[in-house]
């Protein structure tokens, strides 16, 4: 997907870089596949901030995405390619032969009118979903299940993919976008291909107001706060006095936060980079 630059007619346009969304074919979503998305503003059940820097922004409707791809051996036709405000990748509306409509993540190169299908004996083509055990080594996949039948959890954002590196018994070794090598059960489903919108990482908002439209509020530096508000606060706003930490005193910027013992450790062949 190409990038769109702007002439610096205003300060907000100077440096702004957008995605050229010429491939989108619909402006409004399929109503039966959407539902309301309540605005949480970063608050938990107790009404207190649980996630900072969230609030405001444009009202959204959530699009129900088919991460499971459990309509096996039923062909479907791509009707539209649409924008989804809840994720970085575009989505595709698929009409299946049994009358059902579902949204799927749109991989790179997916076109309107293309046939997609899921199952154990389907063609190895982009947007088709198969068990990992029947996909050859070296293929790129996305929307990978970690638990059989749970639905895809890995490689779901714009431009991401996992590579099938090897097969060993009942497991398949995947090279994940983070660089981690992980074993996944051969019966877990994955979708062929790399996700589209690969230039999403190269976009620039251009002004703070566009971040506010997305529901992102300002981030205040800890050094600019008072000592009561942050471990790095005080000292005329200039001196740190210690290594970088979170507002709760946890080391950050490179500090490993993964727990020492997790059930999934035995499935990780090599750690993320």
Swiss-Prot record:
GO terms for molecular function: rRNA binding; structural constituent of ribosome; transferase activity. GO terms for cellular component: large ribosomal subunit. Residues 28-55, 222-273 are annotated as: Disordered. GO terms for biological process: cytoplasmic translation. HAMAP family: Ribosomal_uL2_B (MF_01320_B). One of the primary rRNA binding proteins. Required for association of the 30S and 50S subunits to form the 70S ribosome, for tRNA binding and peptide bond formation. It has been suggested to have peptidyltransferase activity; this is somewhat controversial. Makes several contacts with the 16S rRNA in the 70S ribosome. This is Large ribosomal subunit protein uL2.
């Amino acid at each position: 997907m190409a990038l769109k630059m702007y002439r610096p007619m205003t300060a907000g346009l100077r440096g702004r870089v957008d995605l050229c969304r010429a491939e989108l074919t619909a402006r409004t979503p399929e109503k039966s596949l959407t539902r309301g998305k309540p605005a949480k503003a970063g608050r938990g059940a107790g009404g207190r901030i649980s996630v900072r820097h969230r609030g405001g922004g444009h009202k959204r409707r959530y699009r129900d995405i088919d991460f499971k791809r459990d309509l096996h051996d039923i062909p479907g036709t791509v009707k539209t390619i649409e924008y989804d405000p809840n994720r970085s990748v575009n989505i595709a509306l698929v009409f299946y032969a049994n009358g059902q409509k579902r949204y799927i993540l749109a991989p790179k190169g997916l076109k309107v009118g293309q046939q997609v299908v899921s199952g154990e004996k389907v063609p190895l083509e982009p947007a088709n979903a198969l068990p990992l055990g029947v996909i050859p080594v070296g293929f790129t996949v996305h929307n990978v299940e970690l638990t059989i039948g749970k639905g895809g959890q890995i490689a779901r954002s714009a431009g991401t993919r996992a590579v099938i590196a090897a097969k060993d018994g009942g497991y398949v070794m995947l090279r994940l976008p983070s660089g981690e090598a992980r074993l996944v059960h051969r019966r877990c489903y994955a979708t062929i291909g790399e996700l589209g919108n690969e230039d999403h990482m190269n976009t620039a908002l251009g002004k703070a107001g566009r971040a506010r439209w997305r529901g992102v509020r300002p981030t205040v530096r800890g050094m600019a706060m008072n000592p009561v508000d942050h471990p790095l606060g005080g000292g005329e706003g200039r001196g740190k006095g210690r290594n970088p930490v979170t507002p709760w005193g946890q080391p950050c910027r490179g500090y490993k936060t993964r727990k020492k013992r997790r059930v999934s450790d035995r499935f990780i062949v090599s750690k993320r980079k």
